Each structure stands twice: as structure tokens, then as C-alpha cells.
Amino acid sequence: MKRQIDYSLYLVTSSSLIAPGSTIERQVEEGILGGVTLVQHREKDISTKCFVERAKRLSEICKKYDVPFLINDRIDVALAVGADGVHIGQDDMDCALARKILGDDAIIGVSTNNIEEIEKAAADGADYVGIGSIYETNTKDVKDRLIGITGLRKILEHVSKMHCQLGTVAIAGLNSSNIQRVIYLSEANGKRIDGIALVSAIMCSITPRETAKELRNLIATPPCFAQARSSLTTPKDLLNQIPAALQKLKDFTPLIHHLTNAVAKNFSANVTLAAYGSPTMGESYDEVADFAKAPGALVLNIGILENTKTYIHAAQVNNDLARPVILDPVAVGATTARSKVINTLLNYAYYDIIKGNEGEIMNLAGEQGLMRGVDSISQHTLAARITAVHRLAVERRCVVAMSGAVDVISDGNSTYVIKNGNPLLGQITASGCSLGSVMGVTASICQNDKLLAAITATLLYNIASELAVEAKNSCGDLLVQGPGTFIPIFVDKLHQLINETIKGNVDWIERAKLEKAE
């Protein structure tokens, strides 16, 4: 009878990566004692005789602890040593033939990279599939098979709908720094990856038992940045919580670290100050860890593409400290290079709030979104925008905010539209970028409810624009005559709204046009 398999911590051996002074046998046994649940023995450039001898020793260790032992590729070696099964690649023996040779009780896994390979493996009788490559790895060249978290999630979404039991294991480039992110962000339709396959993390460790324990704990524990869905389920509930949230700014000034484009820096800094935040625009890779130590948030407004390494590092550092990260994927879809960079960012870090205009969000949601430079060209119905925002929020397990004449905001559970604002916001440079700054402030004070944070920021921003165009001088004349006069009055009104709220005057909230999308 075929045994039940725990794929959680899947160790792939490598005799070329053994920690100094250790042996492959010691690394495997210590790894098992620390929590390894399955061992796959892989050898390269070694004689069959040596392969069999080493495999026998490892097989005995695995039997001692009742841990399944698989052989990579070699059906003959698996038979010779009495292994529990094999793992085969796309260029190895066909899975159906391997099943015929090894029998129904053998454990057979297949390396896969796409849905077609998944379907074939299942049809051929595979027990599980190794899915990847998730990231690049030093153990082999996988550049032509990289799928990232985005690709892994699409595959798991497909597997969740298959009418068969098929184990899933993520492979390539995985270690203690990224496995929680991969597990959390790849989950689809309730289907979570069954296991994480690692090589160097354990084989290179001088303390493999402790390393395996740490890895098992990480696999079983949600990441610190995991986002709970809002408990507020109606517009009234949300609006009632805004005053209490903004009151926190009376005694707390969050540091809002911006990695933004040059044209937005000045305005974003002024808006951050008006919103009771403290702006910093440091762009050095070496500074981001120090900035993240201060309570606040990170705003990634994608400007210079050459700063990708810094963007990723900054997001990951803030993820590790559970600091909110706001991503503004500026002009994604406008150029191939920009889309590639933003896709990389999505695969290497978590973002609490993704905000953008219609074109940007529709592109990320997999829909056609027209861009004219950094500007969006509206072409979708409100219903289509609501659907796209909700879907993207579900996929990325975050809050998504689409700005426009009507704003759409969702946490994947509840979706809302906001019908406040003035068209002059669209006629000044960096108005969208600076909304991200306000979201950074509100996310810092709404740590447990990023939906409330995004809605609060958007209402503040939009209502401030309405009040600005209504402002009059002592003679009764309108102060705002166009985009140029709008900017300073808008910044003033934004500051006044928060200041009045702190004092207890919340009449402005009555202007909110917040509706729940059906």
C-alpha cells in the first residue's frame, strides 16, 4: 500500500555542496532530525557503482527515521537500493513507463514548469510534481524555466480545479529568506503548495539540524506581513473608524521613505508633511535598512528602472519588519522594460497596497490597459474596473486601489467605490504619486486594516481637492483659478482636514461618497 507523504520540507542532496568537515550522510541525518520530511538523492558526474553505494547508505538512514527516500532520474539505482520511488525530469524516462517498472506503490514525482506538463504528469500517474523554477539557483542553469511566484500561483490555481490528488512542491532558489513569501503569495483558491524543495540551505549548513528546524517553523508559520481582511464591512463602519485612526497622528509622526521618480519628489514631500508624516527620499541601497527601523512605511513609486535592486531590497527589508509597503507601478504596460521590472518586483516582495491608475491596474490584472506615457486612457466600464481590482487584490493578497474619476478599492473581500474629487487633480504633476504618500501615512496608523488605510487616504485626498476649489478670499472670490493656484490651496486643505480631525471636528466626513460595490 502506498504511504501518505508529507512533502513539507523536501531535501534534495548534493555531494558538491556539503558543509566543510561534514559528510553527505551526516547532513541528511541531521536534516531529518531537524524536520526534513522527504529526501531526494541527486548525483552528478559519479559512477553508477559509487551512486549505488552512497544511495544505500542514505536509504538506511531514511528507513531508520521512516522518511521516504527517492532517487533522482535513475530508475535502475532506485530498484537496486530499494528506494521508495524516483523523481524524474522532462528529459528523463517517461513517467508512465517509470510507473510500469516501479509499480503502483512507488512514489513518483515529475519536474514541471507549466500547466501542460502538470496535466501530462497527472495523466501518467505521478504522485506529485515539482514546480519551478521559482528563482534562479546556483545548482543548475534555470533561466529558461523561471516562473516566479506569479507563475507558481497560476499553476496552483489550475491544480486546485483538477479532479485528482496531486502533490505539489516548489523548487529552485528557495531558502529561509523567501519561503514564507512564496507559500503565502502563491496560494490560490485555498490551494497551498504542499512542500518546499531545498538543496544548499541544508546541505551547506554547518548546523543542518537547527537549519531544518528553522525551515520547518517558517513553512508552518504565516509571514509577519500576512494581511488580515478588514473586519469593517459597510461604508458606515469604515467612515466611523476614520476619526480614531487619524487621532493617532497627534502623538505619532510616521517616517515615509520614498523611492520615487524625480518629478514627484518635491510635491510628495510637501504632501507627506501636510499629512502629518515625515518624508525622506534616500535612494541609496545601503540606507534602506536604517530607514526601515523607524516606524512608518515605504512608498515605491517606480521611476528609474536601473534602481530595481534597491527597490527589491527596500521592500524585503520592510516586509521583514512588518512595515507597510505601497507600490505604485508607474506606467506598467507602457513599455516592455517597465513591465518586466514591475513583474520582477511582484515576484520578490510583498506589497500591502498596490495603487495605480486605470491603465496600470488593468495591466497588472491581466486586462488590456491603454497608457500614454504615465497617463491612463480610460476605456473600461466601472463594472469591469471593479472586477479587475477585486481579482488583483485576491491574487496578490493585498489592498488594490485604482484611482480615477471614480476610485475603486478592494482587499479581495470587500470592494468600494469613492466618487469624491476634483478634475484638477488630474491636471497637476505627481498627484497620483503623492496619493501614495498619504497612503503611507494612513497605513502606518492602520497597521491591522490596510483597506481602511487606503480608503481614508483617498477620501482625505479627494475631499481636500473639493474644498480647495471651493475656497474663497475675503472678497468672496475663488482662490483657485487653475492648476497653478490649485496646488498650494490643496496642500493646505489636506493639512487642515487632519488638523481639524485631531481637534475633534469631523464634519468633513459627511462629504464622503463611499459606496460598497455589489
From Swiss-Prot:
Condenses 4-methyl-5-(beta-hydroxyethyl)thiazole monophosphate (THZ-P) and 2-methyl-4-amino-5-hydroxymethyl pyrimidine pyrophosphate (HMP-PP) to form thiamine monophosphate (TMP). Residues 1-229 are annotated as: Thiamine-phosphate synthase. InterPro entries: Aldolase_TIM, Hyethyz_kinase, Ribokinase-like, ThiamineP_synth_sf, ThiamineP_synth_TenI, TMP_synthase. It comes from Schizosaccharomyces pombe (strain 972 / ATCC 24843) (Fission yeast). Keywords: ATP-binding, Kinase, Magnesium, Metal-binding, Multifunctional enzyme, Nucleotide-binding, Thiamine biosynthesis, Transferase. Binds 1 Mg(2+) ion per subunit. It catalyses: 2-[(2R,5Z)-2-carboxy-4-methylthiazol-5(2H)-ylidene]ethyl phosphate + 4-amino-2-methyl-5-(diphosphooxymethyl)pyrimidine + 2 H(+) = thiamine phosphate + CO2 + diphosphate; 2-(2-carboxy-4-methylthiazol-5-yl)ethyl phosphate + 4-amino-2-methyl-5-(diphosphooxymethyl)pyrimidine + 2 H(+) = thiamine phosphate + CO2 + diphosphate; 4-methyl-5-(2-phosphooxyethyl)-thiazole + 4-amino-2-methyl-5-(diphosphooxymethyl)pyrimidine + H(+) = thiamine phosphate + diphosphate; 5-(2-hydroxyethyl)-4-methylthiazole + ATP = 4-methyl-5-(2-phosphooxyethyl)-thiazole + ADP + H(+). The gene is thi4. One of its GO terms (biological process) is thiamine biosynthetic process. NCBIfam families: PRK09355.1, thiE, thiM. Mg(2+) binds at D73, D92. This is Probable thiamine biosynthetic bifunctional enzyme. Pfam families: HK, TMP-TENI.
